[in-house]
């Protein structure tokens, strides 16, 4: 599955079921740009097992505030609508895969 862009208005419905890795990012963030290809690879690797979502914190401040996102990129793993893990800053693919695997 391709990466899905989510907003404040559709965030909750997108995380309700299954495992989701949400990338809280912004267009001006260098490390956010660096992690983008890693997330694209993960989206392919985890197709059918977990979904990768992206939320622009500048355009969607309510959701970012709700989950206390202070630094970006912040990646939060949700399982059936509940946050179960959080990673802040650029991470290599192997680290993110390890985090996802814990919740599958």
From Swiss-Prot:
GO CC aspect terms: cytosol
CDD domains to which the protein is assigned, alphabetical: TRX_family
Family matches, as InterPro entries: Thioredoxin (IPR005746), Thioredoxin-like_sf (IPR036249), Thioredoxin_CS (IPR017937), Thioredoxin_domain (IPR013766)
GO molecular function: protein-disulfide reductase activity
PROSITE patterns: THIOREDOXIN_1, THIOREDOXIN_2
Cystine bridges: 29-32
Pfam families hit by this protein: Thioredoxin
An annotated GO BP: cell redox homeostasis
Keyword field: Disulfide bond, Electron transport, Redox-active center, Transport
Domain of life: Bacteria
Domain annotation Thioredoxin: ranges: 2-104
Role according to the record: Component of the thioredoxin-thioredoxin reductase system. Participates in various redox reactions through the reversible oxidation of its active center dithiol to a disulfide and catalyzes dithiol-disulfide exchange reactions.
Family listed: Belongs to the thioredoxin family.
Protein name: Thioredoxin
Organism field: Staphylococcus haemolyticus (strain JCSC1435)
């Amino acid at each position: 599955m391709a990466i899905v862009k989510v907003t404040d208005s559709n965030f909750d419905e997108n995380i309700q079921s299954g495992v989701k890795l949400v990338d809280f990012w912004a267009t001006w963030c260098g490390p956010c740009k660096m992690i983008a290809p890693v997330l694209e690879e993960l989206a392919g690797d985890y197709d059918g097992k977990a979904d990768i979502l992206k939320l622009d914190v500048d355009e969607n401040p309510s959701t970012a505030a709700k989950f206390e996102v202070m630094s970006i990129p912040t990646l939060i793993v949700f399982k059936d609508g509940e946050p179960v893990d959080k990673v802040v800053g650029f991470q290599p693919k192997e680290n993110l895969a390890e985090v996802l695997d814990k919740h599958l």
